[in-house]
Amino acid sequence: MSKKVEVNKVVVAYSGGLDTSVIIPWLKENYNCEVIAFVADVGQGEEELEGIEAKAIASGATECYVVDLKEEMVSEYIFPTLKTGALYEGKYLLGTSMARPIIAKAQVEVARNVGADALCHGCTGKGNDQIRFEGAFAALAPDLHVIAPWREWDLVSREECLDYLAERNIPCTASLTKIYSRDANAWHISTEGGVLEETWNAPNDDCWAWTVDPEQAPNESETISLKVEKGAVVAVDGKAMTPYEVVVYLNEKGAKHGVGRIDIVENRLVGMKSRGCYETPGGTIINEALRAVEQLVLDKTSFEFREELGIKASHLVYDGRWFTPLCKSILAASEELAKDVNGEVVIKLYKGHATVIQKRSDNSLYSEEFATFGADEVYDQSHAEGFIRLYSLSSRIRALNSK
């Protein structure tokens, strides 16, 4: 966006960190506009949110709105995505990606409520988040201007940002040295930068924030029971919980046993690769439980289709295409497939592993009578001959034609 565009009131996605603390006064100076701070509570922790309104006002914001999005994020964004089986590039449970559309949606709602004519985010010009936010803004509020300071200003270092605030007597608790870049919400925490920028470096202990080292985890395993209804975990160990409560509870259980760690080099949407240490303890447990019930209740073609949905959904969510017809269609299809995904799963947690050890479902298609190798009381093996001849017919014809 050009600086020549005139705006009167801007709603900025504010985190309380160094970048967004600089953005508020920068917006006022460069756009001569009123700045409203919007804070999304997505479960990043009380420590991150403590005193954040006062900090935003001290930076120059007229008002600061803190919006609790935790329950909605898990129930309306994370759990529906889980039903698709989405794992970006086979490993990543999309912790950061799934939080962005609801943050953008809530930011637009605040902008509408206060009569703002512009939106602002603090994403850099190298990452995925700029695309996720601006893609959501385009779908939800195409009439609002979007300001991306990192693509406009000439500040290039933490030192320059700190100097910028000091020159304006704006208080800031950030330090000059920041080893890692972290992003946390109720679902996961990511750690990037520092030693991780060299792929040959093994992660340090401080690359992990939530989970214990699996080698240092308890020597005694722990089992938990999860009740699944329509592709969502609704109770743990016999206690009914909301989706958010399920995630919080299982995060604590999984972290204690070192569950949910991945060290991944992923393909960013902008073309470059990035490395990060991601922790999703509760999500890893939930994903194992859902896939276990699916094994019982989905027939072969439904299971294959659900896998295809998962791959496509992972890219749509990662690429910031949540508010698109295709994403809505995939979520609707997975919702239909999940109608029979009901059951109970027992998972053993032990030194970094979440292992399914028991599973059952009233909708199970598994039949012990059909699967055993005993007497043919319910399955006549001679019937297989005709099926095989038809199944291999195209191969037979191709072979005959080649002679």
From Swiss-Prot:
It is an enzyme of class 6 (ligase). L-citrulline binds at residues 92, 97, 128, 132, 181, 190, 266, 278. It holds the Pfam family Arginosuc_syn_C. InterPro entries: Arginosuc_syn_C, Arginosuc_syn_N, Arginosuc_synth, Arginosuc_synth_CS, Arginosuc_synth_type_1_subfam, AS_cat/multimer_dom_body, Rossmann-like_a/b/a_fold. PROSITE patterns: ARGININOSUCCIN_SYN_1 (PS00564), ARGININOSUCCIN_SYN_2 (PS00565). Pathway: Amino-acid biosynthesis; L-arginine biosynthesis; L-arginine from L-ornithine and carbamoyl phosphate: step 2/3. Its EC number is 6.3.4.5. L-aspartate binds at residues 124, 128-129. ATP binds at residues 13-21, 40, 122. GO terms for biological process: argininosuccinate metabolic process; L-arginine biosynthetic process; urea cycle. Homotetramer. This is Argininosuccinate synthase. It comes from Aliivibrio fischeri (strain ATCC 700601 / ES114). The lineage of its organism: Bacteria, Pseudomonadati, Pseudomonadota, Gammaproteobacteria, Vibrionales. The gene is argG.
